[in-house]
Regions:
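Catalytic-core segments of class I nucleotidyltransferases/pyrophosphorylases
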Residues: 117-121, 152-220, 224-242
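Conserved donor-nucleotide/metal-binding helix-loop-beta segment in metal-dependent transferases, i.e.
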Residues: 111-140
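The conserved acidic donor/metal-binding loop of glycosyltransferases
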Residues: 105-108
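Short acidic-glycine loop/turn motifs at beta-strand connectors
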Residues: 146-152
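A short acidic, often aromatic-flanked loop/helix-cap motif at beta-alpha or helix-coil junctions
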Residues: 72-79, 137, 162, 218-220
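Conserved N-terminal catalytic core of the sugar/cofactor nucleotidyltransferase
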Residues: 14, 18-102, 113-115
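N-terminal nucleotide-binding beta1-loop-alpha1 segment
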Residues: 1-7, 12, 27, 66, ...
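Short glycine-enriched, charge-decorated loop/helix-capping segments at active-site entrances
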Residues: 7-12, 74-76, 187-189
Length: 243
């Protein structure tokens, strides 16, 4: 994404006139009983996210939702923690956390999250999202799930060279407390700290994880081309939660 992200964080790049992360925030604010939104970033971009947060303070305050931006202290790319160690860093800020939605900041999820959230908070089950995809190049660039009875996830593959399923699972995971407690367990032996999908590969062998099949699409802002395509697409067809 260089040079666009040389001095600016990718989740705050504007797509159709709005920061990428705004789309996720809009969806989260539609979720009942949401208690908090927590963003972790590095020291370089901490002030960028703090300014972005100010634009949401009124909306979250009205709903009684706590919102914080955490600085992981990292100043240079070569010392980056990776997404999973960032997650562990945030989890350390809480004495207890019953459940959480863990999401990448550079994806736009073009389908409502609230129905999945409501199923999640009124149960004791871990969920991922499954979208049908036949394009092999796209299948190789994301998480893939193999589904069993009742849509339980039998296997999770992070960016496989040879996809064994047509169900993609984007980087948004609905995790109960028992699953969140396994993040440090995973990090204690694995060197795969970056993509959170590697943790899901581990988790599905330890705890039940189920897929929610949805219709829609995910815009992954992973390259300049995908960024421009997302901007063009959402400029023509505005984002709507009801789709």
């Amino acid at each position: 994404m260089y040079p666009l992200t040389r001095d600016f964080p990718k989740p705050l790049l504007k797509v159709a006139g709005r920061p990428v992360l705004d789309y996720l925030m809009q969806q989260l604010l539609e979720c009942p009983y949401l208690e908090g939104v927590y963003v972790v970033t590095n020291a370089r971009f901490f002030n960028h996210f703090c300014l972005w947060k100010e634009g949401w303070d009124l909306h979250t305050g009205r709903r009684g939702i706590e919102m914080k931006v955490y600085n992981n202290g990292v100043k240079y790319d070569h010392s980056r923690l990776g997404a999973l160690r960032d997650l562990a860093f945030v989890l350390d800020q809480f004495a207890s956390l019953e459940r959480a939605v863990v999401a990448a900041g550079d994806n736009i999820f073009c389908f409502p999250l609230s129905p999945i959230w409501q199923r999640f908070i009124f149960g004791n089950v871990n969920y991922v999202i499954a979208l049908f995809e036949t394009d092999k190049d796209r299948l190789r660039r994301t998480g893939i799930v193999e589904l069993g009875p009742d849509d339980r996830v039998i296997r999770f593959y992070e960016k496989p060279n040879e996809p064994l399923s047509f169900w993609i699972s984007p980087a948004i995971y609905f995790l109960q407390r028992s699953a969140l407690m396994r993040v440090k367990e995973y990090l204690s032996f694995s060197s795969m700290h970056d993509a959170p999908g590697y943790f899901l590969e581990y988790l599905v062998n330890k705890e039940p994880v189920y897929a929610v099949r949805v219709k829609g699409r995910v815009l992954d802002i992973g390259s300049i081309d995908s960024y421009r395509n997302a901007d063009r697409m959402l400029s023509v067809e505005p984002f709507r939660l009801s789709e």
